[in-house]
Amino acid sequence: MLVNDHKGRCVFVYNRTQETFVATEARVADGYFSRLIGLLGKRRQWARPGQGLWIVPSHGVHTIGMLFPLDLVFLDSKKRVVHVEEHVRPFRISAVSLKAYSVLELPPHTIFRTGTQEGDQLEIGPMAGQGEGPPAPDGRADVLKSGVPK
């Protein structure tokens, strides 16, 4: 299964196509309650660049009860981007993508900043200290000199 390796953890999200990090610290929501609650009631401080929530499985989300807008990236089971929605305001319902297996909820402007678009291939992996290898000094995933995650 796609998320068993990341259960109850934070992950990094790297866009291999655009060669940029989409999120350096995305929480995994793969249980009933974690998917149900998601980011409801979270304050705007959550929406800093690099933050995120990876909802697995999911074909769509809503922002009812949200306090700030979100960018949404819909991924298939191979972590390829199948749909994006920018700046989804609170109290809205996103599109439903039957091609999607999971959804990334990201701070506003992340899609624009990273150039993420349909067809991009993402890599999602454990943050340093939660998987193999030594943690990086800043607590983020180790990165090769080329900028590609290990």
Identify the residue ranges that each predicted region occupies.
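Compact, glycine-rich, soluble single-domain proteins
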Residues: M1-K150
